[in-house]
């Protein structure tokens, strides 16, 4: 069953000095493993990306520096980074305030392998990445993985923007898992057959075959970061 996650209420644990992390997804998700990582000013986290997995990082609040494979990239707020398997990755926070990151492994370690991202480390800021209009659906999309962005068969990731009357009807993915991280506005989301209102600071996730739908709850629109894992997903509408 799909779940609603509120980041402020998660059970954070200290992963390194000045670094706390907590899981978003649970054992019901087999294709992706997601967590929130909070990095204090001047703190750093170093770890390896497992073989067979892509690592995705999104700066939800604040900025960060991501280093690995003899490359270092500065990430502004709302920037998406893609990191190749086997990379020894270091994330640091050079800024004055705490940085909050959304971290995703697709798939988790020791999973069946699919061709993944092979470009080392790349990053794309929301503010400078092309926006693709989908007039028939009253949506805009900003692609980070797939659709001409970073190439991988392990996931599809994008920011989606709705206007006030955009509606995505109930549907499910029989061959993929989904996660939504809310960035702006209030969204009316059908989770487990019930409508809930979600906003920034929250996420929803759905195991394979779990029905969900969404629309703007109030105001002029919403935006959210959306993952489907793996990339070759099928959508079945009610």
Q: Where in the sequence are the language-model features?
A:
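Structural motif
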Residues: 63-65, 88, 98, 186-188, ...
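Short acidic-glycine-tyrosine-enriched beta hairpin
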Residues: 56, 70-85, 193-209
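Catalytic core of Fe(II)/2-oxoglutarate
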Residues: 94-95, 197-199, 210-221
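Short, conserved beta-strand element in jelly-roll/cupin
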Residues: 38-39, 49-66, 159-163, 172-189, ...
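Histidine-centered metal-chelating micro-motifs
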Residues: 44-46, 50, 79-81, 85-91, ...
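A short, N-terminal "cap"/entry segment at the start of jelly-roll beta-barrel domains
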Residues: 1-33, 46, 96-155, 169, ...
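Short glycine/proline-enriched turns and hinge-like loops at secondary-structure junctions
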Residues: 49-51, 94-96, 155, 172-173, ...
């Amino acid at each position: 069953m799909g779940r609603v996650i509120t980041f402020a209420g998660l059970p954070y644990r200290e992963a390194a000095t000045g670094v706390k992390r907590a899981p978003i997804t649970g054992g019901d998700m087999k294709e992706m493993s997601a967590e929130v990582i909070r990095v204090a000013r001047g703190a750093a986290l170093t770890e390896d990306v497992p073989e067979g997995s892509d690592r995705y990082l999104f700066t939800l609040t604040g900025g960060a520096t991501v280093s690995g494979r003899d490359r270092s990239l500065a990430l502004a707020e709302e920037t998406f980074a893609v990191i190749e398997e086997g990379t020894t990755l270091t994330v640091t926070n050079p800024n004055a305030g705490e940085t909050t990151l959304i971290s995703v492994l697709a798939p988790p370690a020791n999973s069946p392998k699919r061709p993944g991202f092979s470009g080392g480390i790349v990053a794309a800021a929301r503010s400078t990445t092309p926006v693709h209009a989908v007039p028939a659906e009253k949506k805009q999309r900003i692609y980070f993985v797939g659709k001409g962005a970073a190439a991988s068969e392990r996931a599809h990731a994008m920011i989606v923007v709705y206007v006030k009357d955009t509606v995505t009807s109930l549907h499910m993915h029989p061959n993929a898992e989904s996660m939504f991280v809310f960035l702006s506005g209030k969204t009316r989301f059908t989770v487990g057959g019930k409508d809930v209102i979600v906003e920034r600071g929250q996420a929803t996730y759905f195991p394979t075959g779990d029905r969900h739908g969404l629309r703007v709850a109030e105001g002029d629109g919403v935006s959210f970061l959306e993952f489907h894992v793996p990339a070759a997903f099928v959508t079945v509408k009610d």
